[in-house]
Amino acid sequence: MELSGATMARGLAVLLVLFLHIKNLPAQAADTCPEVKVVGLEGSDKLTILRGCPGLPGAPGPKGEAGVIGERGERGLPGAPGKAGPVGPKGDRGEKGMRGEKGDAGQSQSCATGPRNCKDLLDRGYFLSGWHTIYLPDCRPLTVLCDMDTDGGGWTVFQRRMDGSVDFYRDWAAYKQGFGSQLGEFWLGNDNIHALTAQGSSELRVDLVDFEGNHQFAKYKSFKVADEAEKYKLVLGAFVGGSAGNSLTGHNNNFFSTKDQDNDVSSSNCAEKFQGAWWYADCHASNLNGLYLMGPHESYANGINWSAAKGYKYSYKVSEMKVRPA
């Protein structure tokens, strides 16, 4: 069927309107977007409707009800520890527990393996002079002064005079036990000296210093002191040498005497007469436990005397007697 000219003209008009509408859409979108309709076509033409732009959003609706609580999730990793809080108050003291059973007595490990003298300490690497603990043959611990510097070291000092701070004119009991101060003058005690020298052989060294600072010494090959039952008898070996000379050999095999126990061979009490305590014979050639008389003195033989060096009227400033295993 042929289309009439009028129909074709109307179709072209519709297309032209659509073209112009589409071309103007960007500009209209910037301002408004009115609804576009094409209606009223005559005859057999179909009705064509063009949809306009969306309208403005409406007002938000009311808030809905909360949903059902979901399942609990898995536990997360622990967080970093926080700062420590302030220290709380001290708690009450608890009740005292029950006393344990007494253990079996055993030998001290220190006694079994500990040092026996200062030479033993030196051999173990103790090179500093000073006070150390050693163990006597009966396992008694004893604190002694070790001379690690003189003549190769390893000397156990049992007598020291240095400043007159300690009274050496004492009785038998005091010399038996020992007396004095670690910081100054002392006598180690006849029981301890006996224990130190009873086992094996020990050499003796005597060191003397006068008030002019001159040093002298004397050495003996062996030295032992017997026990109290033998009145601490001196058993002395040969004089080896030394700048002080020999002032002790004459006391060999003599008993120890004090002002209250006269064991010498003199008709008088030498300890009382010369105000000391020593292995007096018919009195002495040395008196290192005599009075501290500050060098030259007018009195006779009652100072810290070593007659072979300075006679009987000079009292030494420093005296040390020491032993070492031979």
Swiss-Prot record:
Residues 90-104 have a biased composition (Basic and acidic residues). InterPro entries: Collagen, Fibrinogen-like_C, Fibrinogen_a/b/g_C_1, Fibrinogen_a/b/g_C_dom, Fibrinogen_C-term_domain, Fibrinogen_CS. Residues 72-111 are annotated as: Disordered. CDD domains: FReD. Disulfide bonds join C111-C139, C118-C146, C270-C283. A carbohydrate binds at D282, C283, H284. Residues 55-93 form the Collagen-like domain. PROSITE patterns: FIBRINOGEN_C_1, FIBRINOGEN_C_2. It is found in: Secreted; Cell membrane. SUPFAM superfamilies: Fibrinogen C-terminal domain-like. Changing A285V: Inhibits binding to the 9-O-acetylated sialic acid derivatives. Coiled coil: none annotated. Ca(2+) binds at D262, D264, S266, S268. Changing Y300F: Abolishes interaction with all sialic acid-containing glycans. Keywords: Calcium, Cell membrane, Collagen, Disulfide bond, Glycoprotein, Immunity, Innate immunity, Lectin, Membrane, Metal-binding, Repeat, Secreted, Signal. Residues 317-326 are annotated as: P domain. Residues 115-154 are annotated as: A domain. The keyword Metal-binding applies. Residues 1-29 form the signal peptide. It is a peripheral membrane protein. Belongs to the ficolin lectin family. Extracellular lectin functioning as a pattern-recognition receptor in innate immunity. Binds the sugar moieties of pathogen-associated molecular patterns (PAMPs) displayed on microbes and activates the lectin pathway of the complement system. May also activate monocytes through a G protein-coupled receptor, FFAR2, inducing the secretion of interleukin-8/IL-8. Binds preferentially to 9-O-acetylated 2-6-linked sialic acid derivatives and to various glycans containing sialic acid engaged in a 2-3 linkage. Homotrimer. Interacts with elastin/ELN. Interacts (via Fibrinogen C-terminal domain) with FFAR2. Interacts with CRP; may regulate monocyte activation by FCN1. This is Ficolin-1.
